[in-house]
């Protein structure tokens, strides 16, 4: 799959922007703060329903506007598809596919992308929340129905936490809360699906991770990934950090029916502590995935270069998995200011690894940071305007310049 045309309205610093895109590699180049990342951020939003830079959608709406619009013309095997999302500042977002309204959470069914960014280093060195988000985004791209499961879990968790906080405030004991039993069952039923799906995903990623790491690093350091489950811990810590001893090793849980009894027992075991804290202490919202190199946790032991290689390998492995499973072609690869973070050797190896994908979109502040064969088609961005872009004769819509709406 490729993006033939991207159109933005009141998105970030663009009042309006239109750009026609080519198969293969396209480089968006411009000084920092000009708006080049905003273009690829918009495409990332279409496939993940979120931004890699901010946690709230409101930040994506141009200052002074009430909504932003992202439109993309997609093409696969000669067929075209138009997808659109309207991001509203004070109302629910809205989506369309070929002019027909659809649920926003259905968009990943039609378009998938994998984004590489400087923030990816936090996948190795950062908190568990980033690794959970990585897995969940990939789950939804592979199996779009899981977007509903994840939303249902968030709602059940919120309701259960509200009940626990109320019980703590009123000094109620565990045997006085029959309503909590209902929410326990719901949390276990939904959460077990997520735990099993993540476990199966990590298992599928493992061989791709090994190949991708070798391709990027040029050496085999035995990269591995293993789920770490809070339902297996006797005493989940407040810092939400995986147990490096393996006490929380959840690699064997890839089926929902295997997770349910263990989750049920953990909920019962932790109820007294949860009533003390007013908080749900076990479940997929407290889990992690442990990355290892040469048998040691990458977090805390891997060098800066090894950490970067692992982060890039995780994203490449994700892309290969989507490519293998997809019936709509390759995911679009988005490399946002990544080459500036890498040494010359890793730049070359990463460029070689992504060259075979149908479409690769790259941003860079310095033209020379990008290997030459990836920079042939360049889109120049200046002050929130597209000042130069490729104009393929086969493009279905003309490109027109964006307008300056403020730096971003």
Curated annotation (Swiss-Prot):
Residues 389-402 have a biased composition (Low complexity). One of its GO terms (molecular function) is ATP binding. One of its GO terms (biological process) is SOS response. One of its GO terms (cellular component) is cytoplasm. ATP binds at residues 30-37. Keywords: ATP-binding, Cytoplasm, DNA damage, DNA repair, DNA replication, DNA-binding, Nucleotide-binding, SOS response. It is found in: Cytoplasm. Residues 220-252, 389-408 are annotated as: Disordered. SUPFAM superfamilies: P-loop containing nucleoside triphosphate hydrolases. It comes from the Bacteria. Gene3D superfamilies: P-loop containing nucleotide triphosphate hydrolases, RecF/RecN/SMC, N-terminal domain. HAMAP family: RecF. The RecF protein is involved in DNA metabolism; it is required for DNA replication and normal SOS inducibility. RecF binds preferentially to single-stranded, linear DNA. It also seems to bind ATP. Belongs to the RecF family. This is DNA replication and repair protein RecF. It comes from Clavibacter sepedonicus. The lineage of its organism: Bacteria, Bacillati, Actinomycetota, Actinomycetes, Micrococcales.
């Amino acid at each position: 799959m490729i993006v033939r045309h991207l159109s933005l309205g009141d998105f970030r610093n663009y009042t309006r922007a239109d750009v026609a895109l080519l198969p293969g590699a396209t480089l968006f180049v411009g000084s920092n703060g000009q708006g080049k990342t905003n273009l690829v951020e918009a495409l990332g939003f279409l496939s993940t329903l979120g931004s890699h830079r901010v946690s709230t959608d409101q930040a994506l709406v141009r200052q002074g506007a009430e909504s932003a619009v992202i439109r993309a013309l997609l093409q696969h095997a000669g067929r075209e598809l138009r997808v659109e999302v309207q991001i509203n500042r004070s109302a629910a977002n809205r989506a369309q596919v070929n002019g027909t309204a659809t649920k926003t959470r259905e968009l990943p069914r039609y378009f998938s992308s994998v984004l590489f960014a400087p923030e990816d280093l936090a996948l190795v060195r950062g908190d568990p929340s980033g690794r959970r988000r990585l897995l969940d985004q990939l789950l939804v791209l592979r199996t779009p129905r899981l977007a509903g499961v994840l939303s249902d879990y968030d709602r059940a968790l919120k309701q259960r936490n509200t009940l626990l906080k109320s019980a703590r405030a009123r000094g109620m004991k565990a045997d006085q809360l029959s309503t909590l039993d209902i929410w326990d069952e719901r949390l276990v039923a939904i959460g077990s699906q997520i735990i099993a799906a993540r476990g199966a995903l990590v298992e599928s990623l493992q061989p791709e991770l090994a190949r991708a790491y070798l391709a990027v690093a040029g050496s085999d350091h035995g990269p591995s990934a293993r789920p770490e489950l809070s339902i297996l811990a006797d005493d989940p810590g407040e810092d939400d950090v995986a147990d490096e001893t393996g006490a929380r090793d959840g690699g064997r849980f890839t089926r929902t029916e295997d997770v349910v009894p263990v989750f049920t027992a953990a909920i019962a075991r932790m109820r007294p502590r949860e009533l003390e804290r007013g908080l749900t202490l076990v479940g997929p919202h407290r889990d992690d995935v442990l990355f290892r190199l040469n048998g040691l946790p990458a977090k805390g032991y891997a060098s800066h270069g090894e950490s970067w290689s692992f982060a890039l390998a995780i994203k490449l492995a994700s892309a290969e998995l989507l490519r293998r499973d997809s019936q709509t072609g390759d995911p679009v690869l988005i490399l946002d200011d990544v080459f500036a973070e890498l040494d010359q050797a890793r730049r070359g190896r990463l460029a070689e690894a992504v060259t075979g994908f149908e479409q690769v979109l790259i941003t860079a502040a310095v033209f020379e940071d990008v290997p030459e064969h990836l920079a042939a088609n360049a889109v120049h961005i200046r002050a929130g305007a597209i000042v130069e872009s490729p104009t393929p004769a086969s493009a279905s819509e003309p490109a027109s310049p964006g307008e300056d709406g403020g730096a971003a």
